[in-house]
Regions:
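Core SAM-dependent methyltransferase catalytic element
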Residues: 233-249
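A short glycine-rich, Lys/Arg-flanked "PGG" loop and its adjoining helix->strand segment in the class I
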Residues: 160-178
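Short, glycine-/aromatic-enriched active-site segment of Class I SAM-dependent methyltransferases
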Residues: 183-201
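S-adenosyl-L-methionine
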Residues: 107-161
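Conserved class I S-adenosyl-L-methionine
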Residues: 80-90
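A basic, amphipathic helix-loop patch mediating RNA/tRNA/ribosome contacts
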Residues: 1-50
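Conserved SAM-binding loop of SAM-dependent methyltransferases across substrates and taxa
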Residues: 91-102
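Glycine-rich helix-loop-beta junction characteristic of Rossmann-like nucleotide cofactor-binding loops
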Residues: 16, 73-80, 143
Length: 249
């Protein structure tokens, strides 16, 4: 019969944890896996040769951070020292990503309240503006007149409504805007109803991205297209999303 040991002891013996207290914390937080099975009892005994892995914590406070990180990497965008404006901040995934990438400050704007992650609410670099509708964003509502980088992740509204309201806050001479394009909120009511909220037609998705890109270039003569890409992560309901980047001349 194979020897068996407590799960917390196995983690320490395999150097997956430094102490039994740390091992217990990993187990109780649900991060210890055997294949796809989550092991949550520190004192339960298992065979010495059981396969164990530690699930790494997410890099950012929400999935949105991974979306922005992919765009920054693809287009080699440096946010070090940048002053960020996050429109539709919600939990703060974009803000968290930007700060970890070196942004100096972040102003978070959201029409809701009590959504920003506690980690970001406590960060002195972050200004949290709640119950503020970006469609009617006045300069007096913000701590700065312009920003080095503006990121946008909004739902249930078209970017054609948000972009004109936000573009004035992008700094001239190289300011950056990155917007998450969500086809389900850009398509016509007929297409959305037909698709039951999840746009699966790739031709329609691509056409929507092209339409938003053309809109931005038409409305903002001082905009230069950086590029666009598929989001590495789909929306909550499986919707394909895109990231679109512009610079202000």
């Amino acid at each position: 019969m194979k020897p068996r040991h407590r799960l917390d002891e196995l983690l320490v013996s395999r150097k997956l944890a430094e102490t039994r207290a740390q091992a217990k914390a990993l187990i109780m937080s649900g991060r210890v896996l055997h294949g796809t099975e989550r092991l949550d009892k520190p004192g339960k005994e298992y065979p010495d040769d059981i396969a164990l892995t530690i699930e790494q914590p997410p890099r950012y406070v929400s999935r949105g951070g991974e979306k922005l990180a992919a765009f920054l990497e693809k287009f080699t965008i440096d946010l070090r020292g940048a002053r960020l404006l996050d429109i539709g901040a919600s939990t703060g995934g974009f803000t968290d990503c930007a700060l970890q990438a070196g942004a100096a400050t972040a102003t978070c704007v959201d029409v809701g309240r009590a959504q920003l992650h506690a980690k970001l609410r406590a960060d002195p670099r972050v200004t949290n503006l709640e119950k503020l509708n970006a469609r009617h964003l006045a300069p007096s509502a913000l701590p700065r007149p312009d920003y080095d980088a503006v990121v946008i992740d909004v739902s249930f509204i078209s970017l054609k409504t948000i972009l004109p309201a936000v573009w004035p806050f992008v700094r001239t001479n190289g300011g950056l805007l990155i917007a998450l394009v969500k086809p389900q909120f850009e398509a016509g009511k007929t297409e959305v109803d037909k698709a039951r909220g999840v746009i699966r037609d790739h031709a329609l998705q691509d056409a929507i991205l092209a339409d938003i890109t053309a809109f931005a270039q038409r409305e903002f003569p001082d905009a230069r297209l950086i590029g666009s890409m598929d989001s590495p992560i789909t929306g909550a309901d499986g919707n394909r999303e895109f990231l679109l980047g512009l610079r202000k001349n």
